[in-house]
Amino acid sequence: MKYDFSALEKKWQARWADEQTFASSADQDKPKYYVLDMFPYPSGSGLHVGHLEGYTATDIMARYKRCQGHNVLHPMGWDAFGLPAEQFAIKTGTHPRLTTEKNVASFRETLKSMGFSYDWSREVNTTDPNYFKWTQWIFLKLYEKGLAYISEVDVNWCEELKVVLANEEVDEKIADGYTVVRRPLRQWVLKITAYAERLLEDLDEVDWPENVKQMQRNWIGRSEGVEIDFELRCHRTNLRVYTTRPDTLFGATYLVISPEHPMAEKLAIAQQLVEVKKYIEQAKLKTELERTGLQKEKTGVFTGSYAINPANGEALPVWISDFVLTSYGTGAIMSVPAHDSRDWEFAKKFGLPIREVIKSPHDVQEEVFDGKESVCVNSANDEISIDGLDFKTAFDRMATWLESKGKGKRKVNYKLRDWVFSRQRYWGEPIPIKHYEDGTMRPETNLPLTLPEVEAYHPTSTGESPLANIESWLYGEDEHGKFRRETNTMPQWAGSCWYYLRFIDPQNGNALVDPSREQYWMNVDLYIGGAEHAVLHLLYSRFWHKVLYDLGVVSTKEPFQRLFNQGMILGEDNEKMSKSRGNVIPADHVLSTYGADAVRLYEMFLGPLEQVKPWNTHGIEGISRFLNKVWRLVWDENTETQKTTDDKPSEAVLKRMHKAIKKVTEDTEQLKFNTAISEMMVLVNELTKTGCYSRETTETLLVLLSPFAPHITEELWQTLGHTESISGAVWPVFDAKLATDDVLTIAVQVNGKLRGTFEAPAGYAKEDMIESAKKVESVAKFLEGQQIIKEIAVPGKLVNFAVKPQQ
């Protein structure tokens, strides 16, 4: 009987669906394992082989944990609101809902054809009113807690798309060729900054890649500094700046404020006013990225005003420059060009003084010195001296002096800004707020507030969403009076902030999630997705989760206990897959050619899961040959009879099998799937070479392989007489004695260089290892005439001699 992947994969996918094989159990006595994908946006281009990598990894873990006796929750859904469907609607007039439904159907079919063991009864869609009812409910809870507010915000406006972009979205849109400018707009904003400290501290509680944690730390950007008041000459007020280096105050030679600073025009003297206004207008046309880029040429304009340095009484010129942002600190900085590269470049361009106040190894007029490791110089007045002090001591002494003089105060600041939450588009969750004629706002009482049908999807010329044109939906009256509904909708991030909770209890119409179910399943044990979401989805989800924790809706402080970022699979040309490059490999094509099991195995065998690696279609053919070898362990293709026997395997085969159990188990637990597969290949080769068709070894192999290649293993499992699914088979346990080599190869090094090897029995004592190593002929000559300073023996692995010539 030949291996026909197409027939048997369809057979088992249909049976799994009919029998709901992978539905999570309601039994809360079993240990749970919640494994989750970052659910996809269902685009019109469909899934390619790169998309399948993360989904395959989570499915392997789901199947592996089921075999280990866990109650597994492994769901799938759709992050289906978003701009692409709306842009398609603008071009074609097709309702975004229809486009989304079509795309979802395509994605679902591909995922099912991969044999992923999702519990499809828990499928969610962020555009479903029964789902976004609870997204709106969370928003209203944020509003009640004062964490959602309206503000006139300078936003990133994309003229072509007629939409506001979050700061985190700007880079991508510019890269796609869109123009992004700054303009003020009435916006809903979420006060994520209220949770900045907790978002920072609780990173220590989760098992995440360190680079992702660091990206979030940098994005939150906690800094300890001092706010210092500089008295403005000719103005009866102060200019407050924020600095993390009060120890350099004596070296400040000018101040800089942002173009949006409320005092920008007020500080301009008559002769400078025209230039100042012109500069402010030019700054509005730039994005923050364009303004703050390190390679950007420094620009600025002098206001004509001066402020007094509280440390030495000097009058410092006040400049305006777009590299300073109002959103960070106070929107004003003191510039110490000798010890800050950006300030140094600005000073050089505009001929401003440069004064050394940190002892430098070179002339600061020629090169900046920004090291904290040196000590202060030229930093004293009649009341205080910090000369000779290190950074920390000088910081504390200067801060204390400024506070005692009423000229400053210690302050913790964050780069993190409140989250601009509203979008001027149709295809998003309506914000459930009513604006009354008396200026008050009240929440919608009947959720969900659904989207009305519209004739055109273009944003209005005023920047409002198309909802502003639907008067029958827009205006209403209730017991509080006449009202106008909010026309902004939520960003795509809203629905993905909490979807992991809805998977736990997707049909609940009375609560976001049942408390007992939430307490059993949370938090997510393993979350796999791309690192590109480090400061977007992951940060937003953590914020919402902490709000829900404070509300008593969830029982954990963090949503995702373990995070793993898969590496990107590149095209065969070693470039990122994209339509423009023509290097996209559609998932459906390779599935029809090679089958799901081969694709799953090849995706995982390409290399370490976390690494970037190129696709090679020829490589998958080797995987197909491996699967045929597995098939032939059970079936004789010539006689169409089974080969399986009840014979006891030889001692050598048993040892090989238990080594494989140990290696595959350990590697799977650590998501080292490529080496787990390699170990199974070694086992299959051994069984084939020795002609071992023992039921014991074959069934063990099938269970080990089942998370990786579920269709072929399910078929062969049933062929061997089992009536229950292999997904419920017990994961094999290795015998430590059999999994250990009797004889080991020991490496011998001299001064860290390999000079020979010898064989020794397992458990060989360190002293015996050292003596045996000295007798190795190729080693002895490197010890001759040498004094052995140190002898190191690592049991079962190596011996190293540290030597030096004898005196």
From Swiss-Prot:
The gene is leuS. Keywords: Aminoacyl-tRNA synthetase, ATP-binding, Cytoplasm, Ligase, Nucleotide-binding, Protein biosynthesis. ATP binds at K579. It catalyses: tRNA(Leu) + L-leucine + ATP = L-leucyl-tRNA(Leu) + AMP + diphosphate. One of its GO terms (biological process) is leucyl-tRNA aminoacylation. Pfam families: Anticodon_1 (PF08264), tRNA-synt_1 (PF00133), tRNA-synt_1_2 (PF13603), tRNA-synt_1g (PF09334). One of its GO terms (molecular function) is ATP binding. It is an enzyme of class 6 (ligase). It is found in: Cytoplasm. GO terms for cellular component: cytosol. Disulfide bonds: none annotated. PANTHER family: LEUCINE--TRNA LIGASE, MITOCHONDRIAL (PTHR43740:SF2), LEUCYL-TRNA SYNTHETASE (PTHR43740). Its main location: cytoplasm. This is Leucine--tRNA ligase. A motif ('KMSKS' region) lies at residues 576-580. Its EC number is 6.1.1.4. Belongs to the class-I aminoacyl-tRNA synthetase family. A motif ('HIGH' region) lies at residues 40-51.
